[in-house]
Amino acid sequence: NLKQVNIAIRKFHTIYNLHRYIVITPYESTLYFKDAFCDCDYVEIIDENKVLNKKKFNELCAEFLKVKNDHKLFRINWYYQQILKLTYTLNYKNFPGKRIIIWDADTVPLKKIKFFNEEDNPILYGSKYEYHIPYFECNNILFGKKIIYPKLSFVTQFAALNSRMRKDLKNVLVKYIKSSNITFDKYYAAKAVLHSISIKHDNEPIYGSHFSE
């Protein structure tokens, strides 16, 4: 991924005037990334464990999903990546009061994309290609009500959020944690998502895809 990330960020920097780029990577890769971007003072490399401790996440998976048959088939590493991004995004100490863009590491921008409109609200991009019902089932549990969604997937290679949306999403998950009598701590996002997966019905096998950030 190092080569792709290097190309993507340098391409991004020629298209956009962004404040800072954050690369979150496993600890063993941090030195390689720092060397690759040693000439870029606008790039910061972060060990993923400082955002979401992987050992603790594994423990939470075992705790919340033990009620599921074949819970050992749960795709821990894949879900870790989803919740890692969510955890970083919801920490308001990261770029307080600013808009942020989450960008997949294996994606290179080819031309400028408009992320926000004139009212500072994110522009939504969707397609029918990856419309996946279990994602929306988890959302309904987390939001505490059934929402009528368009039959589109908003799973793209990026996500744009403004400051208000980040705060609102955090409030939704905190409310869910409290209503479910789950202990609130810095792992609240992981707990909320894993709990919602644990109580949803089993249309999708446990090794399937139940949630996407």
Locations of the language-model features?
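Short, well-formed alpha-helical segments that are part of the catalytic scaffolds
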Residues: 2-14
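Short, solvent-exposed loop/turn segments at secondary-structure junctions
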Residues: 1-2, 27-30, 50-53, 105-110, ...
